[in-house]
A protein has these predicted regions:
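Conserved alpha-helical segments that form or flank metal/cofactor-binding pockets of metalloenzymes
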Residues: 66-110
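Penicillin-binding protein/beta-lactamase superfamily catalytic region
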Residues: 111, 115-118
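Basic, often amphipathic N-terminal segments
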Residues: 44-45
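Solvent-exposed alpha-helix faces
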Residues: 40, 73-77, 136, 172, ...
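Structured surface interface patches that mediate subunit assembly and partner/cofactor docking
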Residues: 4, 8-33, 48, 52-61, ...
């Protein structure tokens, strides 16, 4: 998923949600467009890596850029599996335990590590090509089943569309990871939409969210997903990247 461990805010009850946004305020077209943009920008960033820079550190602790590429490939395939088996997938069974967010995060982190270790030892570009094919194929599956149940958590029904929002946010967050590894910066074209979409697909994290002050939604999402917005690899002259307009 989007983070590597329990989010920093996932420790206690209470708190407020970002601008009290709800999934109903995010259009299907908007989420799908942002989803496609996330896949596109990952592919664009991947083209900037060399054989050497694929081995560079990233904001994801202990993951090199090539590991992020492999993780993206795994997660895109996982999303297909979850949709194939919904609403009785292994993710749905995990969420139905109603475990707290930090426990869920640890279990998903172990799953991520096991899947990454099982991947073939291929190059970053090969992982990204497999990711892009899988992620785009998943995107094409979403519209016909958008309102169907994907899984539930503590009485909240997470639809296929809401899970698409979580996937959308995951792509943009990992785009930032890759950009930072290159010494660049990145933010999506509509960070508030991405934040709201992420919220819709992750009810296990809400409403245990604190610290929102109406500031920059992208910085907030980076921090909420366990990232340090100030993480720096190499700052070059490149002014950064923005998501391609739809």
């Amino acid at each position: 998923m989007g983070g590597r461990g329990a989010p920093p805010y996932a420790g206690g009850p209470g708190g407020t949600s970002p601008r009290d946004s709800t999934v109903s305020r995010v259009s299907r077209a908007g989420v799908l467009a942002a989803y496609r943009d996330g896949v596109t920008v990952i592919c664009e960033l991947a083209a900037h890596f060399t054989d050497v820079s694929w081995l560079s550190a990233t904001p994801c602790a202990e993951w090199r850029a090539v590991d992020v590429a492999g993780h993206l490939r795994c997660v895109a395939d996982d999303y297909h599996e979850y949709l194939d088996d919904a609403p009785a997938s292994r993710l749905a069974r995990l969420m139905s335990t109603n475990a707290p967010a930090d426990s869920l995060a640890r279990k998903l982190a172990r799953q991520n590590a096991a899947e990454l270790a099982a991947l073939p030892d291929v190059s970053g570009p090969e992982h990204i090509m497999a990711f892009a094919d899988s992620a785009r194929s998943y995107g094409r599956r979403l519209t016909p089943c958008w309102d169907l149940s994907h899984h539930t958590y503590r009485g909240t029904d997470v639809t296929v569309g809401a899970m698409a929002g979580a996937a959308c946010a995951e792509w943009h967050l990992h785009a930032w990871d890759l950009a930072r590894s290159l010494g660049k910066d990145y933010r999506p074209a509509d960070p508030e939409l991405v934040l709201t979409a992420w919220r819709a697909g992750t009810p296990e994290l809400w409403p245990v969210l604190t610290g929102w002050d109406g500031g920059d939604p992208w910085s907030f999402l980076l921090t909420a997903s366990g990232r340090d917005p100030g993480w720096v690899q190499v700052l070059g002259p490149d002014p950064g990247l923005t998501a391609a307009p739809e």
